[in-house]
């Protein structure tokens, strides 16, 4: 995929949930988008910073509610500053 391929970004404090969503998105949208998955807030913000520096568009941010030290809403606030054009949503898992 070209470096400018838009990104669907997934982050969840539960690595299993993050990877399951990543796999689902990859099956459905993997030909048109690059799927990036993280499970920690600091790693997620670092990945988003790198994408911003490289001017890679982020089309969608799917963010879990609890990122082990940061809320999903707080993460979205930081992410919005780097990628204001991205569609932003939160996710939750119900057992």
Language-model regions, residue ranges each:
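Non-catalytic signal-transmission and effector/linker regions of two-component phosphorelay proteins
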Residues: 1-34, 49-57, 81
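Hydrophobic/aromatic residues positioned on beta-strands within the core alpha/beta folds
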Residues: 63, 88-93
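Cofactor-binding loop segments of dinucleotide-utilizing enzymes, especially the Rossmann-like FAD-
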Residues: 13, 40, 93
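Short amphipathic alpha-helix used as the core "switch/output" element in two-component signaling
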Residues: 46-49, 66, 72-87
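Short acidic, S/G/P-rich loop/turn micro-motifs used as interaction or catalytic elements
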Residues: 14-16, 66-70, 95
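Conserved Asp/Asn-Gly motif in the active-site loop of CheY-like receiver
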Residues: 35-42
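Active-site residues of response regulator receiver
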Residues: 59-65
